[in-house]
Amino acid sequence: MTTVSSAFATVAEGAKVVTPRWKKNERNGKLRVMCRYGGSIVSPPQTKSPRYVGGDTRIVAIPSSAETSFASLVSHLTVTLKISYPFKVKYQLPDQELDSLISVEADEDVQIMMEEHGYLSSESSIPQSRIRLFLFPLKSQQSNEAGASQGDSDQCKVETDIDWLGIEESNKPIREELTQPVLQHPKTEMWFVDALKSVEMMQTRRTNSGTSGSGDGNGGICGQESMMLETNSSFGSTSSSVSSSNLPPIKSSGEDNIANSQVKFAPIESVTSNDNSAVTPIPSHELPSHSHAFENKPSSNLYVAELNRPVPVPISGYPPFMNQAQQQHIQVIYTGQPYITGNSPMTLPATAYHHTNHVYYQRPPQPYPIYYIPVEQYSSRHVQALPVKPSTVLNYHQVDSPVVRTSSPLAPEFSSQVYPLSKPVDSSVQTSSEATLNTTSRDAFIYNTDVDDDNDIAHAQIYKSQPPAPTLPSQY
């Protein structure tokens, strides 16, 4: 008996060890986890840490049947959270970031998740230690949903663009034509070509209206026949013709002159007689308006047709004859440039005379040559000169001269031209010259010496006509 009880205790202890830990904290037989779905994980550039943005967060109670089966867990979450699309299950541990989520794809993954939750619950009862479930839609489902949403938006846009035209769904060809781009629509291009042709023909008609001849009337382009275009027009019409009601009125230069030359009179409503008889209204005959320019006329020349129209005469009540209308001439006044009198090419234009005062300029005085003459300077003090012998008088011609003198004898051809000259020596002149020597500068002596040398012809022939000294070769 004791052995059986001990064995039962051992089995009980073993069973206790095998029993999962998460069942210790069960409340009412269910496990509660936090579940987030419908959002997405983003990484803000400021924090650079992933965050779960959007979606809903709910606490889901998982029954015991879903703790070991992945299919049971998915079906329970689908029914509880009312999710209609396939999703992927991931869970986050409390000490991990959102970039470290753990995927749950099999029964073994579910059991591991429950064990982790049991360990956390046994160690701490803080709500933050719970495992968080995250439900993410599959990528194929996301792409399908995106395509479906885009298709729905395009369909709504097309219906919005077409429904205002009042076209029902049964007229699918018309709806398809209207949904095409406007610039690529074939009928739009045909209409544009027709409009260009019409404008070109109108311009040709206007230019040929004034230059066409007055023969059989076939020189210009015919009125109604030239404006018919057998082409496909826009919006389903098989043929189109440019009528005068759809085109603006076109006036040529001749029509403008006719309109300016016509005289319009107000219609006379009544004419009264002297006998106070009954009033008889007389209608006035008016010309047709210019808006009927494209009507069928026997003449194709609009310019001739305008000249042949009858002129209204309000007094007589009858239109004038054709010859009277033809005799009327159109007066054309050309506005030229104003007349400017000019001179003939053979005449000179008369210039206005203006009295001008002559200004006399006085010429500056003509410069005259300046001569420097040495003047003897006399001192206020009377210096008594000592008697000097004539033999000791200083000879002014013995002052050093820049001219080189040589002691070589004269050549025989120059000896006949040398004449000795004698100068009288005056004592008074010598005395004054001696006084001048003490008061004048060396420059005065040099000047006097040069003057005397120039006056002495023999001296100049002897000393100044000698050949220059030989030049020595340069050492460098």
UniProtKB/Swiss-Prot annotation:
GO MF entry, a single one: protein homodimerization activity
Knockout-associated phenotype: No visible phenotype. Double mutants sub/scm poq and qky poq have a stronger pistil twisting than single mutants. The triple mutant qky sub/scm poq has a dramatic pistil twisting phenotype due to defects of valve cell growth anisotropy.
Biased composition (Low complexity): 233-252
InterPro entries registered for this protein in UniProt: Gynoecium_Dev_Regulator (IPR053198), PB1_dom (IPR000270)
Keyword set, alphabetical order: Cell membrane, Membrane, Signal
SMART domains xrefs: PB1
Signal sequence bounds: 1-14
Compositional bias per record (Gly residues), positions renumbered to this chain: 212-222
Tissue: Observed in seedlings, roots, shoots, leaves, stems, inflorescence and flowers.
Cell wall biogenesis/degradation among keywords: no
One Pfam family recorded for the sequence: PB1
Region annotated Disordered, chain positions: 204-256
GO cellular component terms attached to this protein's record: endomembrane system; intracellular organelle; plasma membrane
Domain of life per record: Eukaryota
Places the protein is found: Cell membrane; Endomembrane system
Its job: Collaboratively with SUB and QKY, regulates cell growth anisotropy during gynoecium development, thus linking together cell-cell communication and cellular growth.
Complex formation: Homodimer. Interacts with QKY and SUB/SCM at the plasma membrane.
Name this polypeptide is given: Protein PAL OF QUIRKY
Native organism: Arabidopsis thaliana (Mouse-ear cress)
Organism lineage string: Eukaryota, Viridiplantae, Streptophyta, Embryophyta, Tracheophyta
Gene: POQ
